[in-house]
Every structure is written in structure tokens, then in C-alpha cells.
Amino acid sequence: VKVQAMAVQQEEDGMIFCLVDCLPGEYPMNSTRTNEGGYEESDLRKKLNSEILNLFPAELTDMMTPFDSGDLLRLPTEKEIFGGNYYGEYESPYVKQWKPRKKRRNRMAFDGTKDENLQWYWLMNKIRESAPSFSSVNSDGYAYYYIASYSLGVRPVFKIKNIV
């Protein structure tokens, strides 16, 4: 799979990158209609750090450094994309919107196929007022949410460690 990533935020231990577009294919957040356990216990989190991570070349994964969760890949959060929590659980005041995501076009993503259809994609926040749903970005680049057992696009985030 050939993908492009954009640098979105510098941290002490590395640079965070987010894919420019979604991976080919769609994935459910969970196999059932629930957000119980949040992203941390979701089927998609497990899949991201196994079968999806295995799609990345070793030259890239060797340069990755884990996030605080221990994961090499994760989904973006609602606040990183939109600068606030419109539907999802509230995030720390220290989480800021990534500068490139202030432009709506940079929140939009294609589906990873040669047809280049605009794609809805998952965010990691579970919805406050809806037991079966998680936050998402719609094809127009706006905040929304979707039922966890439905399949949407995936736009992974990873961190490349600083070279000392």
C-alpha cells in the first residue's frame, strides 16, 4: 500500500504524522453496536496495531516511536482535527488542533483508491450521548459521529522518533 503522510505536530520525543488520505478499505470500530470500553478496548485499535501496522514497510516502522498508550498507530482525536469536542468525550485542555487541520480541505480525505472518492473516517472519541457511536469526520470535512459497527475509512497517525 502506497500512502502519503503529513507532519502535524512536533513533540519532545518525535514528530507526529497523519496520513493525507484514508487507507484503502473501510473498517468498523467494533463488531457490535457499542462504544463500551472506548477506543482503548475497540476492535479497530487491535487491528491498527497488528494487521494494519503490518502493511507499513519495515523502514518506516523501525523509525516509529510509541505513543503513551504503547501503540505505534492510532486514530486522530476530535480535538486534534477540529480544535474542540463537538460530539465526543472531552479531551485535556493540553490537546490542541493540529495547524494543518484548521483548513477544512486538510480535514477531508480520499478513500485510498484510484477512484479518489471523498471518505468519512473514524476518530478515537466515543460519543457522550450515544452508547453505540464514535466521533468521525464526514466527507465534507465536518465533525459527525457514526455507529461503531458500521465501516468507515481509517486515517492512521504515527510518530517518528527524533534523530539525536
Per-range role (PLM):
Residues 1-164:
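Collagenous Gly-X-Y triple-helix signature in extracellular proteins
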